[in-house]
Regions:
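Conserved cytosolic catalytic loops of P-type ATPases
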Residues: 26-50, 199-200, 231-325, 422-466, ...
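Membrane-embedded alpha-helical bundles of multi-pass transporters
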Residues: 110-124, 153, 172, 411, ...
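Conserved catalytic phosphorylation-site environment of P-type ATPases
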Residues: 289, 348, 383, 396-469, ...
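Flexible metal-binding regulatory segments at protein termini and peripheral loops
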Residues: 1-125, 150, 232, 248-251, ...
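P-type ATPase nucleotide-binding
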Residues: 449, 453-580, 592, 604-620
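Juxtamembrane coupling segments of multi-pass membrane pumps/enzymes
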Residues: 181-184, 190-191, 206-267, 298, ...
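Transmembrane helix-loop-helix hairpins at the membrane interface
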Residues: 86-240, 351, 715-720, 726, ...
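Conserved ATP-binding TGD loop and adjacent catalytic N/P-domain core of P-type ATPases
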Residues: 17, 30, 341, 431, ...
């Protein structure tokens, strides 16, 4: 189980890297992930909270257990942007004193502005005034020095260390110049006095601190925006509920509501907790939770979720889940936990950040030494070294990945797509093969009546006869007929002597005649059926439908076709995946004929039929040999396959087990959200790469420029103040680039492009076709398929009992005798192998 902590005192990627290393060394810690963006840490393992906090404090930072109060308000407070107001006050004060300092130090020289009379020819007074103003600005921004030197003492230098050293060095050298100038004036050396006057860097020391504060404030403000989606979710949680106690309405805080309590909700109010409607009807706006903009009609017996809005009627509800067990709380937990994890691509930046600051300090010292050896003055060499310190920015590197992940995660949450980890958000876009479970994923998972073909009676009469016998059955196909008849307000006939013919059909007595319903094979054995009618039934079967025959006495009443119909959006979703260069595979336990009919309508690339529930995981494992696999499912039997896949996606309406096993949850239960999730992942990953590129290139170009590498060749020279300005904007630019993701329409497929990839599948894979006698049904297909795929050399077996064949794909040579024996051991006869 992951323990979450709040971490204080971190200012850049070097800090988060230091904390991560310190905690990882604690005995019992299995993994540790620190987020600079949310100032949080996730730790897995058996280590105690006390030992983890002690390790963080030893590293020079503060830590506390997150969510100790376990209240929404505590989480909201944690995400509140507390830094921007503080930095704004610091900035206003710094700019005020800096303006005076710049006026005194440079105004009269650059623009000829007049100085106060008491400064006239009083160089020591001017120096002391600059010293005093600089000290005030340093006190205002003392946090840089406290954190910076604390990091240096703990041997974990960070960005604040670079700022403190840069500004501090400018200040110390300026103080030295002031004392030297005072000595020269006492000795009456006017020329030396003027020389030391130009060695003052008080304005540089102050400007560095002010400009870095500007950058920090912009960065904090932008970082605050990246958590807007999570804050919006937290704000959805209602604060109060109206309970019904002894028939009276009593307003209480939501944390007082218990499971089983009855409460009322009026139009326009938010649902306080997850509940079931016990009285009334309404339409509920679930857009904040699922991204679905159209209100959903709700009646007695339907469930409603916390945070959704009652748009229409007055309803009474019974609480079914409260506190952290509500759907809203679970969504918040998923998004929050994902923010605390790290994407694999972040490891590059982490490794660089760990050595970045010490390396920059060394480069700055080398720069100073080289310029001194080249004969330059101490002031000139120091200016080059300070420029190196203040232009270098580990923050941009550290923020490149987490800000993009946070924004991407928030965008997904707004659309009802929940990524459980940062890794799942990164990996989804690399999908090469999408495996879709048929029932409940491509199809609705509920059989429906698709065709009614009566003979010499009306459709309603046929449906009424069928309804009369099916109403007493629990079979899923019977339920489809019942729903259809009840939808037309039909009443069943009063039948007697109901019988269930095992494996064949149903029958009952009505007006002295037997009404019988069943399969084509069963009814054909009772009465003669014309070839024309049989061909109609065969056509229905080819379309993936199940034709049910009904007769009365010795007369055929008609055919009712039932099918698990394809969701309206399924073909569109599959087409979008294919346009992204993703191969779409449909996985089902149905017989090959029905499966291929559904697959054709849906437009999938490949159909794998006859797969037993326990065989789905094996199919996914085999497909992984060809490329990265994304599995989409909703049932208990999908859980192993979801876990086995590189990325598992669960339909939100599916079972808890499937949702727990998945990496991504689709709250709207729409297949079109699969390409949306892939599209979001690809765009987020691209944004991360852009951020990392600019963060790296900024430092690669900036550090040599600051060190003065180009001065001998091109005369390019960087003033420390411009270096500080560049540093202050670098992190802001990275965060702003991540925020651009918010303007990307992840539902628009127009800019999708195919990503070509090399298949892992062996190009020399062989296939063999086996002619098999004795297979009678889909169960036979499953037995043969399972036995053949049990061979190590067989990657796939496509079996058809109707064709009497098995097409076997081999990854290595296997003798025909072995294949033959494998099938015949199951009780079937192998005629030939080619």
């Amino acid at each position: 189980m992951m323990k979450k902590f709040n971490v204080t005192g971190m200012s850049c990627a070097a800090c988060s890297s230091r904390v991560e290393k310190a905690v990882s060394k604690v005995e019992g810690v299995q993994s540790c992930s620190v987020s600079l963006l949310t100032n949080s840490m996730g730790v897995e393992g058996s280590a105690s909270e006390e030992s983890i906090i002690a390790a963080v404090e030893k590293a020079g930072y503060g830590a506390s257990v997150a969510g100790a109060e376990k209240k929404q308000s505590a989480e909201t407070d944690q995400l509140k942007d507390k830094d921007t107001p503080v930095l704004m006050h610091r900035l206003i004060a710094s700019v005020g004193f800096l303006a005076v300092l710049m006026y005194i130090s440079m105004g009269h020289m650059m623009w000829g502005w007049p100085l106060p009379a008491f400064f006239a020819d009083n160089h020591i007074a001017m120096g002391l005034a600059q010293l005093l103003l600089c000290v005030i600005i340093m006190v205002i921004n003392q946090k840089f020095f406290i954190n910076g030197f604390k990091g240096l003492i703990h041997r974990s230098p960070n960005m604040d260390t670079l700022v403190a050293l840069g500004s501090g060095a400018s200040f110390v050298y300026s103080v030295y110049a002031l004392f030297a100038m005072t000595d020269a004036q006492v000795k009456g050396n006017a020329e030396l006095v003027m020389s030391y006057m130009h060695e003052f860097y008080f304005e540089s020391a102050a400007m560095i601190l002010t400009l870095i504060t500007v950058g920090k404030m912009l960065e904090a403000h932008s970082k605050g925006k990246t958590t807007n989606a999570l804050k919006a979710l937290l704000n959805l949680a209602p604060k109060k509920a109206t309970l019904l106690i002894d028939g009276k309405e009593t307003e209480v805080t939501v944390d007082k509501v218990k499971k089983g309590d009855v409460f009322v909700v009026r139009p326009g109010e938010s649902i306080p907790v997850d509940a079931e409607i016990t009285d009334g009807s309404t339409a509920v706006d679930e857009s904040a939770l699922t991204g679905e903009s159209i209100p959903v009609d709700k009646v007695v017996g339907d469930t409603v979720s916390a945070g959704t809005i009652n748009k229409a009627g007055f309803i009474k509800c019974s609480a079914t889940a409260v506190g952290e067990d509500t759907a809203l709380s679970q969504i918040i937990k998923m998004v929050s936990d994902a923010a605390a994890t790290k994407a694999p691509v972040a490891k590059i930046a982490d490794k660089v950040s760990g050595v970045f600051v010490p390396a920059v300090i060394v480069i700055a010292l080398i720069t100073i030494a080289v310029w001194l050896l080249c004969g330059q003055t101490v002031g000139y060499a120091l200016a080059r070294g300070i420029s190196v310190l203040v232009i270098s920015c580990p923050c941009a590197l550290g923020l490149a990945t987490p800000v993009a992940i946070m924004v991407g995660n928030g965008m997904g949450a707004r659309k009802g797509i929940l990524f459980k980890t940062a890794a799942s958000l990164e990996e989804a876009g690399k999908t090469q093969i999408a495996v879709l479970d048929k029932t409940g994923t491509i199809t609705k998972g509920e059989p429906k009546v698709t065709d009614i073909i009566p003979f010499e009676i009306t459709e309603n009469e046929l449906l009424k006869y069928a309804y009369s016998i099916e109403v007493k059955s629990e079979h899923p196909l019977a339920k489809a007929i019942i729903v259809k008849a009840e939808g037309l307000s039909l009443n069943p006939y009063e039948v007697t002597d109901f019988k269930a013919e095992s494996g064949n059909g149903l029958s009952a007595e009505y007006n002295g005649k037997r009404i019988i319903g069943g399969s084509k094979k069963y009814i054909s054995s009772l009465i003669g059926i014309s070839n024309d009618i049989l061909s109609k039934a065969d056509k229905l079967s080819e379309e993936g439908k199940t034709p049910l025959f009904f007769m009365k006495g010795d007369k055929l009443l008609g055919i009712i076709a039932v099918a698990d119909v394809i969701k309206e959006e399924s073909p569109q979703a599959i087409k979008q995946l294919q346009n992204m260069g993703i191969k779409v595979v449909m996985l089902t336990g149905d017989n090959e004929r029905t499966a291929k009919a559904v697959g054709k309508l849906a437009g999938v690339d490949e159909v794998i039929a006859g797969v037993m529930p326990d065989g789905k995981e094996k199919v996914v494992a085999e497909l992984k040999k060809q490329g990265k696999v994304l599995m989409v499912g909703d049932g208990i039997n999908d859980a192993p396959a979801l876990t086995r896949a590189d990325i598992g996606m669960a339909i939100g309406s599916g079972t808890d087990i499937a949702i727990d096993a998945a990496d991504v949850v689709l709250m709207k239960s729409k297949l079109t959200d699969v390409p949306v999730a892939v599209r979001l992942s690809r765009k987020t990953l691209r944004n991360i790469h852009e951020n990392l590129f600019w963060a790296f290139i900024y430092n690669v170009i900036g550090i040599p420029l600051a060190a003065g590498v180009w001065i001998p060749l091109l005369g390019w020279q960087l003033n420390p103040m411009f270096g500080a300005a560049a540093m202050s904007l670098s992190s802001f630019c990275v965060v702003t680039n991540a925020l651009r993701l918010n303007f990307f329409d992840i539902t628009n497929p127009k800019k999708d492009r195919k990503i070509k990839y090399k298949s892992k599948k062996d190009d020399n894979a062989m296939t063999k076709t086996m002619k098999i006698d004795g297979m009678m049904c889909s169960h036979c297909e499953g037995r043969v398929k399972q036995s053949l795929e049990g061979l190590a050399q067989v990657s796939q077996a496509e079996v058809s009992h109707e064709k009497g064949t098995a097409v076997v794909t081999l990854t290595a040579e296997v003798s025909n005798d072995v294949l033959k024996k494998t099938v015949e051991d199951q009780g079937y006869n192998v005629i030939s192998i080619s």
